[in-house]
Every structure is written in C-alpha cells, then in structure tokens.
C-alpha cells in the first residue's frame, strides 16, 4: 500500500491508501501480541491498546507534532471477537482526531478504558479540539471512519455515544462475558 501510495499524485488516493494501511497495521499489531504471548483466543486488551496508541501516534508524529495523547487504561483481558473491533474503533477515532480536531493548533487526545459496573466496560476516545458540527448526525454522516465505528460497535453489541464537551467525545460501552 505504501508503494502504491507513492506512485500516485492523487492526494485523495494517497489518503485512502494511508487509512487502509493504518487499519492493516492495527490488525498486524494484534497478531504480533498474540504470537508473542502464545495466546490465540484472548489477550490483555490494555497492553494491545497502549501499543496501538503508540503506533497511531507515531504515524502522525511528523505532521502533527503539537498533539499530545494521554491514556488511562485498566487491565482487561478480552476475547479476540471483542478486542479486534475495539482496536479498529480506536484506530478510526484517534485518526479522525489527528486529522480533523485541531486544525494545526495544539491539542490533547485521550483514550480511556474503564469498568462501569460488574461486566460492563467503557472505551472512550476524546479530544479537546473544535468538536463535531452542531448539527452532526451519525446516520447522515459521509465519514467512512465513523461508519466503521458504528458498524463495529453494533457487531459487539456495544452502545455508541457521541457528544461535544470542549471537543468531540466517543464512548463505546460494552459487556464482557
């Protein structure tokens, strides 16, 4: 994909190939962790998430130097059927924040993984950027990334909450077990 991107002068194609490459890298990272730990059915999601956050931040570090990422993650073991979609969701939401939230200004992206009640957890990705449009509606959005977030949330029977509060906030509430 990187070679294909370098061979085209079309910026839109380059961006699409870059986004596809980020999604593939998200999956590759997960598989590296599985093989390294000799686990094939579950993994410590917080470790994967921390590695994924670093990978995504690294891919934007040359062009978005003024953006800081903070993470607050509890330890949580997840099966692959839940970990893979949540990893892809994180990739999409962080990438969207890097690309659209700050318009060249300084900013903070936060990724939080927390326990709400007994077997219910929350993954939250937020930023302190310009926020979503006042009339934002996910059902009429033309963002492929947010469509992917909605589809993957539905796939794991998670509740997706989107709102503005000094920036864009995305909460994915999911059950384990």
Language-model segment annotations:
Residues 43, 61-94, 98-108:
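Conserved short strand/loop->alpha-helix "switch" segment adjacent to the catalytic nucleotide/phosphoryl-transfer site
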Residues 106-119:
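Short beta-strand/loop element within the Bergerat-fold HATPase_c
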Residues 156-163:
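Glycine-rich ATP-binding loops of the HATPase_c
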Residues 172-177:
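C-terminal beta-strand of the catalytic ATP-binding
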Residues 1-29, 34-43, 47:
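Histidine phosphotransfer helical core of two-component systems
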